[in-house]
Design a protein with these regions (language model features):
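Conserved phosphate- and dinucleotide-binding cores of soluble alpha/beta proteins
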Residues: 1-140
């Protein structure tokens, strides 16, 4: 799983580009009134919040809140949630602050090395292709 600075999410590939598993009904859940993604800030010393997701599975405008063990980021599009939590004791941070914390702890992650060959297509619930998965380059 990855989330980027625009709240886009990836649930189908690892950060190294390798396929993880199918999406299943995950995208359908993005049509909920409030979508909350609970994620670790990093996994195996690899930050989960990235500048850009490796593979787009869900658009950021449908993801409202990212909850990590080190803080909560609310999508700026959800001004109602920002206002509702303004005077709370919740550890609210920007998605950028959470990313900076993960990068400070883990270092900047390497971008995956990918070939041009497409090995999978990521489709939206209506069948529209929203991204592709490319073959990971062989190790030198």
């Amino acid at each position: 799983t990855e989330v980027d600075l625009e709240f886009n999410a990836n649930v189908v590939t690892h950060s190294d580009g390798y396929l993880l598993h199918g999406i299943g009904g995950w995208q359908n859940c993005l049509f909920s009134k409030t979508v909350i993604l609970p994620i670790p800030l990093f996994r195996d010393r690899v930050p989960v919040i990235r500048d850009q997701v490796t593979t787009l599975c869900g658009p950021g405008e449908l993801i409202d809140v990212v909850v990590t063990e080190r803080g909560i980021a609310i999508n700026p599009l959800r001004t109602d949630l920002i206002e509702a939590t303004r005077n709370s004791s919740l550890p609210i941070k920007s998605i950028g602050e959470l990313k900076a914390e993960a990068d400070r702890i883990c270092g900047l992650p390497a971008a995956p090395s990918l070939e041009e060959r497409v090995v999978a297509a990521i489709k939206w619930v209506d069948g529209t292709v929203i991204d592709v998965v490319r073959q990971v380059s062989a190790a030198p």
